[in-house]
Regions:
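Active-site catalytic loop in hydrolytic enzyme cores
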Residues: 58, 87-160, 176-179, 183, ...
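Extreme N-terminal starter segment of soluble prokaryotic enzymes
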Residues: 1-6
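CN hydrolase (nitrilase-like) catalytic-core segments centered on the catalytic cysteine
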Residues: 64-79, 149-234
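Short beta-strand scaffold segments in enzyme catalytic cores
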Residues: 82-84, 95-98, 129, 194, ...
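Residue-level detector of high-confidence beta-strand sites
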Residues: 95, 107-109, 167, 227-229, ...
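Short polar catalytic/cofactor-binding loops
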Residues: 8-14
Length: 265
């Protein structure tokens, strides 16, 4: 049995240090083994250009956000999955970093860029990664926001042993991503933690993004274990019985992984 948590925040665009300080403060309200933060929780979302995006992105080696998260995970003896703008070799990526007890396990770079993200970020070829958390004997998979739309992504992670899907998000389609992740959890028999943000950003003459909140943790049985409201910054945690995610039988005769007919898909 482990504990998982989401951290629902409202970042202010461009105020990286303040955003991370606030996010960590919110997370400190609960005790958990895994904390999931929203997509781009360090920078905010609505960039005006690729140049602006790159100027706010940070490298893993010297990033202010990463260092703050490392300090938090060392102090709390926990793991963080957090969405941030990452720069590497002259390119910016919409990424999530995984940090366990001060150690960077790696990053996942978003495979399915949403809408204007295609103008800001470089395309990722990272594939869908799982990360083993030795401290709690748990394997997690990482998705970012719009990845939920593609069931193949969640299935790939489940096939690679993920027991918990960590889903940093800036969801703007009301209720769609949250409902989709209920299905992803059920069809793959995994837990899913969606950490969404709240508020809105209007940084251009035509674009206004309103984020839908309703962060959630759902079970392999398609049950919402804990949720947030549409508005309000909050962290919530609950217990996750990993044995439920390790049992892949829909019936006594049907293993959802072994019964796949992958040759025909």
């Amino acid at each position: 049995m482990i504990r998982g948590a989401f951290v629902q925040t409202r970042p202010i665009f461009g105020e990286v240090e303040k955003n991370i300080e606030n996010a960590v403060k919110i997370a400190s309200q609960v005790n958990s083994d895994i904390y999931v933060f929203p997509e781009l929780c360090n920078t905010g979302y609505a960039f005006r250009s690729r140049k602006e995006c790159f100027s706010l992105a940070e490298s893993l080696d010297h990033g202010r956000s990463v260092e703050k998260f490392q300090e938090f995970t060392e102090k709390k003896k926990c793991t963080i999955v957090a969405g941030l703008a990452e720069k590497d070799r002259g390119r910016a990526y919409n990424s999530s970093v995984v940090i366990e007890r001060g150690r960077i396990l790696g990053t996942y770079r978003k495979m399915h860029l949403f809408y204007r993200e295609k103008l800001w970020f470089s395309k990722s070829y990272s594939g869908f990664k799982t990360f083993y958390l030795d401290s709690i004997d748990c394997r997690i998979g990482v998705l970012i926001c719009f990845d939920w739309m593609f069931p193949e992504a969640s299935r790939k992670l489940a096939m690679n042993g993920a027991e918990v899907l960590c889903h940093p998000s800036d969801l703007v389609l009301p209720g769609k991503g949250q409902t989709g992740m209920l299905v992803r959890a059920f069809e793959n028999h995994v837990f899913a933690i969606t950490a969404n943000r709240i508020g809105y950003e209007n940084r251009g003459p035509k674009e206004k993004f309103r984020f839908t909140g309703y962060s959630q943790i759902v079970s392999p049985k398609m049950k919402k274990l804990v949720t947030a409201e549409r508005n309000g910054v909050v962290a919530k945690a609950t217990r996750l019985d990993l044995e439920l995610a390790r049992k892949k039988f829909a019936t006594s005769a049907n293993n959802i992984i072994e019964d796949m007919r992958a040759d025909f898909y």
